[in-house]
């Protein structure tokens, strides 16, 4: 088989006829009307369900409209069709691409010019985008093959093998043609292995069958290369086409009929007639839509889309634009010469009172509202859709209601009139696809879905990620509060009642639109897509593996190299690599875990120096390596292609880098023998990033500056992802030798850095002559420099006996000295920051005050649990403020951290530490003397499931729900946070479980119940203890009991015993005169609270 042979395979000649996979049109005359009873009868509850034979309709501006998908939406400007003729090349910007399989018997009206590409079937790439003028475009690209490589066995007819395998692959099957040709390529894995013998390329015009046949060949033990690369990736890489950028279409034909898209201009062309325009980075105008839904549960529980009675009652939309030339493209009466102003739309069941600046569409039922919403989407045709948690809730909820309950064909409302798809995919835990992530994915043909919830969770550090919290952090705004329980009540209260619910629904969409523009993640994702040549949706949903893989694929394609299909690593290697990729220590595991996994592969993690736990009230300088892992790859020539493996030619030892890890040794050839391909990529990208950052300084256009900023960020993120790419066991191209070698080299670099700093900086002459410190800044008696922690890419050096201001001026010179003395380009040690006080808790956990800042810097520290009450958080915050900002308390804390337990028993705590103890005493007094408001003592937990589903019944928030039910009060729904307060009933025991004394805060206030002060004080002490644990004497047994030994005890006398206090005082005085007694009584009255008396012992 020495020539390229194309043959056809039709599975239906040997099997039953194929099923018709086309969806039925949604044109049922009868439909189910589900209407809240409150729409017809104000204040009524429940639903009305009837079968309707009328045409679906809506009302807008007191006019009735039939919901026909072919009729323009009344408030949107109709965009004209651009059907040509076009005489020039079409220049367009593409933002999304999808691959469709078109069969020869398809009813798609394809010109004879391109028809040969779909016989018997063909991959058709649909490129969505816009022209310079903002005209929406769909380019149908014909002729792109899907292909992979495999080694032919001796005397094998590869064509017959492919057909035999095609007969065995699982349904559904479809016709395909295959061409098989010999190729000369070498493997990317392993140095000097030469060309792969008997290597053939198998090219298919049917991607689905290509994937199934290749997978079966791999399962049979054949050597297969680059399996899983879809035709879109081949098109973008082989033709150098940007997945997000400008292109040129030549020799095309404009569709005159049989449109498959809703674009204004639809053209067909050959795969060879699309050219890239690389030099331009601006955006055309793209339409965006932010939306939110409001639901009403039929049972009062958290809504479930599968329940017929849990209906959607309102949908809010905000239409806006991104890119250049942003006009009122969605407004009928817009002046196109002015910038666009976001348009607000509200879809609601039943009439609604007017809301300023909002277009309100009213519908008789849920079905009609959903139908109207989809028709609106099809006419507005947004390129971007956003919202908050829409991947996990809103889109899934709408699709479930539309498809399962009302049997709607939602695909027809996408940008594709035929073959459009709209679905949500939730992979099972641990079962994500090849090179993908475990996140919920949304596919919407021709539209990019960008949920702001995962964006915020990735970018913000917050106790919670509610939209209200994110709006406060980024926008300095607060949501208008409307309880979930109030929405159904308001909705059923008539026209005027539905308006507040509509405003509440709309404000979420408005806030998300502002977050979308503020965080500008679409620019960042677009820059990554352009760099890696992957669709924008893969940047959003598929993690970092696919980005690096396609970059390597492109680099290898120009060097006659191919990527192997690597098997996943074993569990032991997986555990070690993933631990190291996260910056952990591979030779140490958490309590209760199997610690043998990492050792079985001789893998050692990146943490190299145990932390010196305690409080350091001296300058602590942090040094880290700039781009540590990329610089290790570049400086040591690490790569798949430089790794010496079995079959590699002999190389002189002087030209080999040996990385010894335990009893294993990984060997790589040096740069003079063969240049690392990974290093070449990194050098190119880092150079490009430097140029972009330089260009940013000269750029005056804000939009262009933002695009360049996201471009340099994309380059940085992609460079840093290389180490993780090699080290993820279930990744697309895992390589333990590279990942382990990077970690080992990094470990050695940190050890060398620590040794150099400690050796040189403890010499006064080095400090003066090399670092330029003045003699008066150095105290020779107290001089001591010590590395107190080393982690992944950072070292923490404590400097005793050196003036911190003078030291701050010299640390840059110290970093440069270490770099020049120990490392070669491009490795560079940099000074990051100086802590003036640092509390080292343990590995990866510390709190410190940075020089020049009033805020505390924390890592791996959650000071108090998220469920803690406000009072506990306030006390912990006060204690930390004293420890880090009060010089006296800081000195006392450092003294305490140096004491032994015997010192503590003999001398007590340092007097400078006394204010911390006093703050705890004051907290205890405030609790016992009822000075703390109930809201500050309120705890909360989420009701994550139905009450009956909990295996552990004795939880405080569950007990509160049972008490609410017993009093016949309103109950929380699943998903709500249940608030509670710990009370002190009569006869309450000291160690009573929390669930027995938990009560609803409103009931506590109304019934004037007593607070369980001791329980709250225990929480305060526990939180402060957990925070300050490193400063307690290390040899002290049961350090968690520290404050019970140093805080003075007090007895708080209940109200009913206060009248006895006077008699006790008289007996103690031994019958003094009445004047003294009156004075004592007067003092007692002054200190007495309304309920307790505190007596210190």
Curated annotation (Swiss-Prot):
Q: Give the highest taxon in the source lineage.
A: Viruses
Which keywords does the record carry? DNA replication, DNA-binding, DNA-directed DNA polymerase, Host nucleus, Nucleotidyltransferase, Transferase, Viral DNA replication
Bias (Basic and acidic residues) ranges: 1078-1097
Q: Per its UniProt record, what SUPFAM superfamilies does this chain match?
A: DNA/RNA polymerases, Ribonuclease H-like
Single annotated GO MF? DNA binding
Q: Which biological process terms from the Gene Ontology are attached to this UniProt entry?
A: DNA-templated DNA replication; viral DNA genome replication
Output the SMART domains linked to this UniProt entry: POLBc (SM00486)
| One annotated Gene Ontology cellular component of this protein | host cell nucleus
Give the start-end ranges of region Disordered: 1069-1097
Location relative to the cell? Host nucleus
Q: Which Gene3D superfamilies match?
A: DNA polymerase family B, C-terminal domain, DNA Polymerase, chain B, domain 1, Helix hairpin bin, Palm domain of DNA polymerase, Ribonuclease H-like superfamily/Ribonuclease H
Q: What is its EC number?
A: 2.7.7.7
Q: What protein family does this chain belong to? A: Belongs to the DNA polymerase type-B family.
Q: What is this protein called?
A: DNA polymerase catalytic subunit
Recorded source organism is Murid herpesvirus 1 (strain Smith) (MuHV-1)
**Gene designation per UniProt:** UL54
């Amino acid at each position: 088989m020495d020539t390229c042979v194309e043959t056809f395979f039709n599975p239906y000649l040997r099997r039953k006829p194929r099923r018709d996979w086309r969806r039925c049109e949604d044109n049922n005359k009868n439909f189910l009307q589900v209407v809240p009873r409150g729409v017809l009868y104000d204040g009524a509850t429940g639903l009305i369900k009837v079968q309707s034979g009328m045409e679906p309709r809506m009302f807008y501006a007191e006019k009735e409209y039939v919901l026909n998908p072919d009729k323009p939406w009344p408030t949107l400007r109709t965009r004209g069709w651009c059907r040509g003729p076009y005489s020039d090349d079409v220049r367009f910007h593409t933002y999304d691409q999808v691959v469709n399989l078109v069969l020869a018997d398809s009813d798609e009206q394809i010109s004879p010019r391109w028809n040969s590409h779909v016989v018997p079937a063909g991959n058709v790439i649909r490129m969505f985008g816009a022209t310079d003028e903002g005209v929406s475009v769909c380019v149908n690209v014909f002729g792109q093959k899907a292909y992979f490589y495999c080694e032919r066995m001796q005397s094998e007819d590869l064509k017959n093998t492919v057909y035999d395998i095609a007969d065995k692959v699982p349904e559904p099957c479809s016709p395909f043609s295959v061409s098989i040709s010999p190729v000369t390529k070498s493997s990317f894995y392993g140095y000097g292995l030469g060309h792969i013998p008997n290597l053939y390329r198998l090219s298919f015009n049917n991607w689905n069958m290509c994937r199934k046949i290749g997978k079966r060949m791999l399962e049979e033990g054949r050597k297969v290369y680059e399996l899983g690369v879809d035709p879109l990736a081949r098109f973008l890489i082989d033709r150098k086409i940007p997945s997000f950028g400008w292109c040129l279409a030549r020799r095309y034909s404009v569709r005159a009929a049989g449109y498959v898209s809703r674009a204004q201009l639809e053209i067909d062309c050959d795969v060879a007639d699309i050219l890239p325009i690389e030099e331009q980075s601006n955006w055309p105008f793209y339409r965006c839509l932010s939306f939110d839904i409001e639901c009403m549960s039929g049972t009062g529980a958290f809504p479930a889309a599968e329940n017929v009675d849990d209906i959607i009652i309102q949908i809010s939309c905000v239409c806006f634009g991104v890119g250049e030339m942003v006009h009122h493209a969605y407004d009928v009466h817009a002046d196109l010469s002015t910038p666009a102003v976001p348009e607000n739309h509200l879809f609601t069941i039943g009439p609604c009172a007017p809301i300023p600046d909002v277009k309100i569409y009213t519908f008789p039922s849920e079905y009609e509202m959903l139908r109207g919403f989809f028709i609106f989407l099809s006419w507005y045709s947004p390129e971007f859709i956003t919202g908050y948690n829409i991947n996990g809730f809103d889109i899934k909820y709408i699709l479930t209601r539309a498809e399962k309950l009302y049997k709607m064909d939602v695909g027809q409302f996408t940008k594709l009139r035929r073959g459009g798809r709209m679905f949500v995919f939730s992979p099972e835990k641990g079962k994500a696809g090849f090179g993908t992530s475990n996140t919920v994915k949304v596919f919407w043909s021709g539209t990019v879905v960008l949920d702001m919830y995962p964006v915020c969770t990735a970018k913000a550090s917050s106790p919670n990620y509610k939209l209200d919290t994110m709006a406060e952090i980024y926008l300095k705004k607060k949501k208008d509060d409307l309880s979930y329980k109030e929405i159904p009540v308001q909705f059923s209260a008539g026209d005027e009642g539905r308006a507040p619910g509509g405003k509440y629904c709309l404000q979420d969409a408005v806030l998300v639109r502002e977050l979308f523009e503020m965080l500008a993640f679409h620019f960042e994702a677009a820059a990554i897509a352009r760099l890696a040549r992957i669709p924008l949706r893969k940047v959003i949903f598929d993690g970092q593996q696919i980005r690096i893989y396609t970059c390597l694929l492109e680099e290898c394609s120009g060097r006659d190299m191919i990527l192997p299909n690597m098997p996943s690593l074993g569990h032991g290697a997986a555990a070690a690599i993933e631990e190291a990729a996260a910056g952990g220590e591979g030779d140490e595991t958490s309590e209760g875990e199997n610690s043998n996994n990492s050792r079985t592969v001789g893998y050692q993690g990146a943490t190299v120096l145990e932390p010196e736990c305690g409080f350091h009230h001296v300058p602590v300088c942090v040094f880290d390596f700039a781009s540590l892992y990329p610089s290790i790859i570049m400086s040591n020539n690490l790569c798949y292609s430089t790794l010496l493996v079995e079959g590699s030619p002999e190389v002189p030892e002087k030209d080999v880098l040996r990385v010894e890890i335990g009893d294993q040794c990984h060997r790589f050839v040096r740069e003079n023998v063969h240049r690392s391909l990974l290093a070449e990529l990194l050098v190119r990208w880092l150079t490009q990033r430097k140029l972009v950052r330089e260009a940013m300084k000269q750029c005056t256009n804000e939009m262009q500056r933002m695009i360049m900023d996201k471009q340099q960020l994309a380059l940085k993120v992609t460079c840093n992802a290389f180490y993780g790419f090699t080290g993820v066991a279930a990744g697309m191209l895992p390589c333990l030798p590279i990942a382990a070698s990077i970690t080992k080299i990094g470990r050695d670099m940190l050890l060398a850095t620590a040794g150099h700093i400690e050796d040189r900086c403890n010499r006064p002459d080095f400090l003066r002559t090399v670092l330029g410190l003045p003699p008066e800044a150095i105290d020779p008696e107290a001089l001591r420099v010590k590395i107190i922690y080393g982690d992944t890419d950072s070292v923490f050096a404590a400097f005793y006996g050196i003036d911190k201001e003078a030291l701050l001026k010299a640390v840059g010179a110290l970093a440069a000295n270490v770099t020049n003395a120990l490392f070669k380009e491009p490795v560079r040690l940099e000074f990051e920051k100086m802590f003036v006080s640092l509390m080292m808790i343990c590995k990866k956990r510390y709190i410190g005050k940075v020089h020049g800042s009033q805020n505390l810097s924390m890592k791996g520290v959650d000071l108090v649990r998220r469920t803690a009450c406000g009072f506990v958080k306030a006390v912990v915050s006060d204690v930390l403020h004293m420890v880090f900002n009060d010089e006296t308390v800081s000195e006392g804390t450092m003294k305490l951290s140096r004491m032994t337990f015997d010192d503590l028993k003999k001398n007590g705590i340092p007097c400078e530490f006394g204010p911390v103890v006093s703050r705890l005493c004051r907290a205890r007094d405030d609790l016992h003397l009822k000075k703390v408001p109930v809201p500050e003592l309120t705890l909360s937990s989420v009701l994550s499931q139905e009450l009956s589903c909990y295996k552990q019944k004795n939880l405080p928030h569950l007990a509160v729900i049972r008490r609410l039910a017993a009093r016949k009060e309103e109950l929380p729904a699943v998903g709500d946070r249940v608030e509670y307060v710990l009370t002190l009933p009569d006869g309450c025991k000291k160690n009573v479980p929390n669930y027995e004394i938990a009560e609803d805060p409103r009931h506590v206030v109304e019934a004037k119940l007593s607070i369980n002060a001791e329980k709250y004080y225990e929480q305060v002490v526990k939180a402060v203890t957990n925070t300050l644990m490193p400063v307690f004497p290390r040899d002290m047994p049961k350090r968690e009991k520290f404050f019970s030994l140093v805080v003075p005890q007090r007895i708080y006398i209940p109200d009913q015993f206060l009248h006895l206090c006077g008699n006790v005082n008289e007996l103690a005085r031994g019958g003094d005169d009445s004047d003294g007694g009156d004075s004592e009584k007067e003092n007692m009255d002054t200190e007495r609270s309304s309920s307790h008396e505190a007596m210190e012992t």
